[in-house]
Every structure is written in C-alpha cells, then in structure tokens.
Amino acid sequence: MKKEKAIVVFSGGQDSTTCLFWALKQFDEVEAVTFDYGQRHRLEIEVAASIAKELGVPHTVLDMSLLNQLAPNALTRSDIAIEQNEGQLPSTFVDGRNLLFLSFAAVLAKQKGARHLVTGVCETDFSGYPDCRDIFIKSLNVTLNLAMDYQFVIHTPLMWLTKAKTWKLADELGAFDFVRTKTLTCYNGIIADGCGECPACVLRRRGLEEYMKEKEGANQL
C-alpha cells in the first residue's frame, strides 16, 4: 500500500487523528477531509486544520450544512440535550452522517486519484450508532465501487478495538502524547482531556485509564 494515496475522513478527534497517523505509516500520499455540517463547536474544524497543518497533510473542508437542516441533533443544536435513553439511539447520532461523509470523501478521492479511504468508525465502542458497524462499511464499499466504477478500499483501523486498544495503537504509532494533548473529542468543545463528563469524554478517559493500567502492569513484569 505504501506507493498509493489515501484520503482520511478527519474530525480532529482522538479516533480520526489516530487513523491519520496510521495512514501516514501505510501510504506514500495522505490527504485529510473534514466536513462542516454546522457543528455546535466550530473549534472542531479549527483543530482539524491545525493538526493537518502540523503534520504536513493537505486538508480539505467540505460544506455539509444541508445535513443539519435534514437531521437536527445534539452535535449541532445547543437546544438539544446530549443524552441516551435506554433502547434509543443517542441524541448525538446524526442520521446519514457516515453514509454521506464517506460518499463525498469517495468523490473527492477519485478526483485526486486516490482509491483508499480511511475512517475511524468502531463497532466495539460504537454507542449504538448503526453507521459505525462493519457490515455497513463493507456494504457501502461495494456500493461506492458500483456507483463510480472505481475500486475503492475503505480502511477501518479501529473497527474491532476498544478505546484502550485505540490508545495503545496511538502509542505504537508514536502519537500518544500528540493525540492526548492536541485532539478534540469532547462534546462540550474542550481540547485534550475535555470536560470529563460528556459521553465522549467518559469513554475516552475510561479507555485511557484502562490502557495506562495495562501498560504499567506490563512494565512491572
């Protein structure tokens, strides 16, 4: 894969930044694409641009504001509480988001002569999001290939990793400190370790604590 080109779907969060570092190890040419869909915290786009610049990765921001008109949600509307009720999808779920993001990323990739798409979706800690499932990604890969008569390959390096394993991967890629201090995962728009209270921060912190405990245990052997 080294001599080929990849497009990373990039939000500037822990998962997509880890995937960006992964892609930089796997491919000769890497570009990032970020989608502006009216995020509640505009800082997300700024963080993504800053990280891409620091890593020397060409970065494209695409306007997807239509998505917010179609599917209002807690990530774009301050009047919608961030919550998850039993038996229901979290209020942070955006209908069609990964479907649209990967479809537009594929169009961009084809224009740029790239056939590899990289996304940080994960089924292990996926919070019930249906568009983070492996079966969806595989299905979409086939659909995109048929729709554009092109041989895309969608890579999901985190698909079967817990959050602790995602921290481990970042460490193995030499990106642990970078990911911990420079990424934005928090739903309340706080960089690095975040607010510590929203679902994204709780998941991130729990994974970090689990990984650090495992690492300390291994070092004591």
UniProtKB/Swiss-Prot annotation:
GO terms for biological process: queuosine biosynthetic process. Pfam families: QueC. Keywords: ATP-binding, Ligase, Metal-binding, Nucleotide-binding, Queuosine biosynthesis, Zinc. Pathway: Purine metabolism; 7-cyano-7-deazaguanine biosynthesis. It catalyses: 7-carboxy-7-deazaguanine + NH4(+) + ATP = 7-cyano-7-deazaguanine + ADP + phosphate + H2O + H(+). One of its GO terms (molecular function) is zinc ion binding. InterPro entries: QueC, Rossmann-like_a/b/a_fold. ATP binds at F10, S11, G12, G13, Q14, D15, S16, T17, T18, C19, L20. Zn(2+) binds at C186, C195, C198, C201. It comes from the Bacteria. Its EC number is 6.3.4.20. The keyword Nuclease does not apply. Catalyzes the ATP-dependent conversion of 7-carboxy-7-deazaguanine (CDG) to 7-cyano-7-deazaguanine (preQ(0)). This is 7-cyano-7-deazaguanine synthase. It comes from Geobacillus sp. (strain WCH70). The lineage of its organism: Bacteria, Bacillati, Bacillota, Bacilli, Bacillales.
